[in-house]
């Protein structure tokens, strides 16, 4: 999604949101990520300006004080950015890939089932279409944000094909977009 993303070329406009819209977004975030509720006022303080940065390909990035927090495509569900995930690692369930998969994940490849079932990888129970943080064997922070394409049980049974779709990874265009004022 952000492989060839450049903030100077891909950003269309930036809109400051009304309080009523912010409340709706906060409710949507709580529905999507129930764990985030007690931390939401810390992540999105009431007095700070909340803006939506609109980009090409119908991508919207939610910012507070210029800090990129969440993104979505076509009015879909929100995904946390890796910078937010590094500050609050508990907001998403984790899956762990083995060391051999790291370079492929960091180049934007989807996570294949064998990379989640081999020694060194840890596959935690999760349903299909769940947003997850991808951790790496021996590393502290998440490498990417992904969406489960199969349930954890199906990944173990089938052990072929794409297990998790890579949505946003370290050093992609969104990662290089530091802040947006």
Swiss-Prot record:
The keyword Nucleotidyltransferase does not apply. It is found in: Cytoplasm. One of its GO terms (biological process) is formation of translation preinitiation complex. InterPro entries: MCT-1/Tma20 (IPR016437), Pre-PUA (IPR041366), PUA (IPR002478), PUA-like_sf (IPR015947), Uncharacterised_CHP00451 (IPR004521). Pfam families: Pre-PUA (PF17832), PUA (PF01472). CDD domains: MCT1_N (cd11609), PUA_MCTS-1-like (cd21155). GO terms for cellular component: cytoplasm. Its main location: cytoplasm. Plays a role as translation enhancer and involved in cell cycle regulation. Belongs to the MCTS1 family. The PUA RNA-binding domain is critical for cap binding, but not sufficient for translation enhancer function. This is Malignant T-cell-amplified sequence 1-B. It comes from Xenopus laevis (African clawed frog). The lineage of its organism: Eukaryota, Metazoa, Chordata, Craniata, Vertebrata. The gene is mcts1-b.
